[in-house]
């Protein structure tokens, strides 16, 4: 019987250890740390070429709303200069003396982005500038969350986006 009791005790200890029954007392108070809010941003590096689909990306649109967009190391911000710089296939206008900020960026769109694509991405906030063209599928369309923030302007020719400018007003297109 002594042998049987030893086996039972050993089995009970082994099973208890295996299952890992432990009681943890939660006496220490938990503290909640505040999370810092992260401002949406968008950074693009390199040639845009046939890869302008980022203009339809919700992260890009949100970064425009929060005035936090950077292309090839140049942050789009209000500047009071007239310096113009060509970088890759983009034209930066109003470039600061240090070359790290510009008021506007222009680039040609070489792939097929349609007016319907930008209308879907920007929704009811996309407006048409009243200009020379009376055609519904041509003209300058723009999105700007508020007058003092970044905006984006699309030159549309027969339902096809051909040029984009991102920056602060006053806006000037090359078309």
UniProtKB/Swiss-Prot annotation:
Q: Name one GO cellular component term.
A: extracellular region
> Does this UniProt record's set of keywords contain Cell division?
no
Task: Output the superkingdom of the source species.
Answer: Bacteria
Q: Primary place of residence?
A: secreted
What are the inducing conditions? Increased expression in vivo during human sepsis. Highly expressed under biofilm conditions after 24 hours of growth.
The signal peptide, as residue positions, is 1-36
Q: Which UniProt keywords apply?
A: Secreted, Signal
As for subcellular location, the record says: Secreted
What's the family? Belongs to the IsaB family.
Q: What is this protein called?
A: Immunodominant staphylococcal antigen B
The taxonomy runs: Bacteria, Bacillati, Bacillota, Bacilli, Bacillales
Q: Which gene is the coding source of this polypeptide chain?
A: isaB
């Amino acid at each position: 019987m002594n042998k049987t009791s030893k086996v039972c005790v050993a089995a009970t200890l082994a099973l208890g250890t295996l299952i890992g029954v432990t009681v943890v007392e939660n006496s220490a108070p938990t503290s909640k740390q505040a999370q810092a809010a992260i401002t949406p941003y968008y950074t693009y590096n390199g040639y845009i070429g046939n890869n302008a689909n980022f203009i339809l990306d919700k992260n890009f649109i949100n970064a425009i709303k929060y005035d936090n967009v950077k292309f090839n190391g140049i942050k789009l911000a209000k500047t009071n200069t007239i310096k113009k710089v060509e970088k890759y296939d983009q034209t930066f206008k109003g470039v600061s003396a240090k070359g790290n900020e510009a008021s506007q960026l222009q680039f040609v769109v070489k792939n097929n982005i349609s007016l319907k694509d930008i209308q879907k991405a920007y929704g009811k906030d996309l407006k048409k500038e009243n200009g020379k063209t009376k055609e519904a599928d041509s003209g300058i369309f723009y999105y700007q969350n508020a007058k003092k923030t970044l905006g984006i302007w699309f030159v549309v020719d027969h339902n096809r986006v051909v040029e984009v400018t991102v920056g602060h007003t006053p806006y000037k297109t090359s078309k």
